[in-house]
């Protein structure tokens, strides 16, 4: 499926996300295991090389990982991304944990949890990826960005870019402007 999707989207895409972390797709997260991921990344990279030649353009591949990984698994994934020269990583998808929301009846429903309960967990994964990758590939920080401060924290933890989901739903399109203004006013990131 990934190879078919890659072939179909490649001519039209600016970049392609390979999501191996959706909690809503049965058994998908098993693809984050070292042996399976190694094989998948190898096949994707070979296909990307062929498609680059066919279409005369390089479309970056970005791997989206889960926040519910052990430190060992995060390090293993980071090393595989380096080994296969993957173009970027998205840290992270939604979580299957329900820490901090156990009191709500909806917490027992299946699927991924996003928003504020995810902030710290996603930032922890981002920080660990940053430490292992050492700026070798871009990291897109996502997960629990509910304020301009959260966005700045992602950048400070090693994100090269950020993505918004739940924060955008709650705050609307002006949320993007608020974040850009806050980040640009930070002397460290004024360029």
Predicted regions and their residues:
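Internal alpha/beta core interface subdomains
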Residues: 1-24
């Amino acid at each position: 499926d990934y190879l078919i999707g890659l072939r179909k989207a490649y001519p039209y895409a600016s970049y392609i996300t390979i999501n191996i972390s959706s909690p809503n797709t049965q058994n998908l997260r098993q693809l984050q295991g070292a042996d399976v991921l190694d094989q998948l990344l190898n096949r994707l990279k070979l296909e990307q090389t062929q498609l680059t030649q066919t279409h005369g353009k390089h479309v970056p591949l970005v791997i989206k990982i889960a926040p519910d990984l052990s430190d060992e698994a995060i390090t293993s994934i980071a090393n595989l991304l380096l080994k296969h020269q993957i173009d970027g990583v998205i840290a992270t998808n939604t979580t299957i944990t329900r820490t901090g929301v156990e009191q709500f009846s909806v917490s027992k429903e299946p699927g991924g949890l996003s928003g504020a309960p995810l902030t710290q967990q996603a930032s922890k994964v981002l920080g660990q990826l940053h430490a292992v990758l050492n700026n070798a590939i871009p990291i897109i920080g996502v997960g629990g960005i509910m304020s301009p401060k959260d966005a700045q924290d992602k950048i400070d933890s090693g994100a090269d870019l950020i993505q918004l989901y739940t924060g955008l739903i709650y705050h609307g399109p002006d949320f993007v402007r608020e974040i850009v203004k806050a980040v640009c006013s930070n002397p460290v990131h004024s360029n």
